[in-house]
Amino acid sequence: MTPWYLYLIRTADNALYTGITTDVARRYKQHQSGKGAKALRGKGELTLAFSAQVGERSLALRMEYRIKRLTKRQKERLVTEGEGFEALLASLQTPTLKSD
C-alpha cells in the first residue's frame, strides 16, 4: 500500500493551501508549473510549508478536510511547530464506537 501525505503550500500573499498526495515532490512541481490545483494558479511564488505522512487515502482525506477548516492562526502553528498534528491524526485513526 502506497502511503499518503498531507501538505501545505504557502503562496506569495502568505495564504496556505492544503492538499494530499502520494508523492509530495511531484505534486509540488505540478503546482509550481501551473498544472496543479486551480486555486494556486497565478498566486506567485509557492513554497512547501509543511508535509507529513498520514497513512491510507481515507485518513488523508479526513485530515485534509479537518485542516482546511482550521483558522489561519491554527494552520500557522501547525506549519511552524507541528502543533496539533499528531493529536488530530490520532483522533481520526481511533474508531468511534456508537452505544445504543
From Swiss-Prot:
Its family?
Belongs to the UPF0213 family.
Q: What SUPFAM superfamilies does the record point to?
A: GIY-YIG endonuclease
Identification of the protein by name: UPF0213 protein CKO_04549
Higher taxonomy:
Bacteria, Pseudomonadati, Pseudomonadota, Gammaproteobacteria, Enterobacterales
The record's listing under HAMAP family reads:
UPF0213
Question: Where on the tree of life does the source sit, at the highest rank?
Answer: Bacteria
PANTHER family assigned: UPF0213 PROTEIN YHBQ
* Ranges for domain GIY-YIG: 2-77
> Which InterPro entries does the UniProt record give?
GIY-YIG_endonuc, GIY-YIG_endonuc_sf, UPF0213_domain, UPF0213_GIY-YIG_endonuc
Species source reads: Citrobacter koseri (strain ATCC BAA-895 / CDC 4225-83 / SGSC4696)
| Pfam families membership | GIY-YIG
